[in-house]
Amino acid sequence: MVQLNQKFINSIAQEMPPHLSMDDFVHYCGLPLRLSIRVNTLKITSDALRAILEPRGWQFEPVPWCEDGFWVTVPDDCQPGNLTEHYQGLFYIQEASSMMPPCALFMDKEPRQLLLDVASAPGSKTTQLAALMHNQGLIIANEYSASRTKALHANLQRMGVANVAITQFDGRVFGAHLYETLDAIQLDAPCSGEGTVRKDPLSLKNWCPDEIEAIAELQRDLIDSAFQALKPGGVLVYSTCTLNRRENEDVCHFLKERYGDAVVFESLNDLFKGADKALTEEGFLHIWPQIYDSEGFFVARIRKTASVARNTDDPRFVSKFPFVAANRKELSALEEAMLALGVSLPEDAVIVTRDGEFWLMPAPLDGLLTKMRFQRIGIRLAETQKHGIKVRHEAVMALPCNQMLSIEPEAAKQYLMGRDIALDNAGKAQGEKILSLHGAPLGIAKHLGNKLKNSLPRDLCRDNVQN
């Protein structure tokens, strides 16, 4: 059993609601965290994925707050992260509690055109937001750590996300750069991680109450900046994976005290059946591990009802956008190359070029380029080569394809391992084809008649693929 820091136990005993048991808390903290996944509805339905995996011995239990989330039990020899279905982006291995903030943000079903995810990496919530937005609009996915942006981009590509612009800033800058610009904001704040002990038994080993105030100060700065960046009428969801009030309720009350009636706490009681078990008097969800057999978590939904005074100067920023709009000739050549593979471009596609590359930009990007610097925007569709235009892997992973060549699971495994696929009935060479499994794309291969020559980018090839 996990050994909890006694100072933490003494502190949290004063925080826990009287109807909950400390013995239950300690017991659940010592249990392994249940494995959970979220189905990527940009590529497949939940019913379709269950029909694929249940015959292999998978058992699914719905996560009550996420329509496409499931706790799963898998066979002992199965490694879900190595499955072909995982590599092709049909599901994301995501802790159940972390599915809650995006669901809270979209619980009213209001359309969101311009959204900020303040702390995006590795991408679980960002990709969930993209699915809820049906790959429409724009998500600004911010990650301060340069080393973590690589994982973020890899997951966006794997899951077929096309509506994201990546930034790399301290999250406290957005109020200044994007004052009252955004329709919605997801702020999963850095925290002391008190709720993560089931995933990391050593997370509380060095727990120290003196550090919490420093963390809470950062959280107050982050939520203040986020609220400044939010449009009047917009919604902010604040969340943490910790348990103490200073990093949770108190941070939300700080915002209320600062901006008064412009801040409205919206109750999450109707987010799912049973939410009342974790509901605070303000309408927040303060989730203790024993309530839903999950991580500890906190979620608040906050509406901005009126404009507020700007508390920072408008920063001067000179944008150097390295792209130019594709001309008619370039667009015609691109469309011909995409059509040959059966890839469809959106009707409102904004296509730009740079150094012979074609990029698809999210439509709502206009007006933002003069406000801040972006590390990466949209998806790379294709590039001009000596013998014509070559469509890129990330384009076929993110855009509708209607001419895919279906292959068997074993062939898909070989493809993801970077190997060519021999064809039993040699015929006429057919050129580049998009390979698919379960009706979802795997990537591009060149049909040479007697084999499919692998075109999967080398950095995406894996040695440990399972079926």
UniProtKB/Swiss-Prot annotation:
Coiled coil: none annotated. InterPro entries: Methyltr_RsmF_N, MeTrfase_RsmB-F_NOP2_cat, MeTrfase_RsmB-F_NOP2_dom, Nol1_Nop2_Fmu_2, Nop2p, RCMT, rRNA_ssu_MeTfrase_F, SAM-dependent_MTases_sf. It is an enzyme of class 2 (transferase). The active site is at C241. Its EC number is 2.1.1.178. It catalyses: cytidine(1407) in 16S rRNA + S-adenosyl-L-methionine = 5-methylcytidine(1407) in 16S rRNA + S-adenosyl-L-homocysteine + H(+). One of its GO terms (molecular function) is RNA binding. The keyword Transcription does not apply. The keyword Transferase applies. S-adenosyl-L-methionine binds at A119, S120, A121, P122, G123, S124, K125, E143, D170, D188. GO terms for biological process: rRNA base methylation. GO terms for cellular component: cytoplasm. HAMAP family: 16SrRNA_methyltr_F. Specifically methylates the cytosine at position 1407 (m5C1407) of 16S rRNA. NCBIfam families: nop2p, PRK11933.1. This is Ribosomal RNA small subunit methyltransferase F. The gene is rsmF.
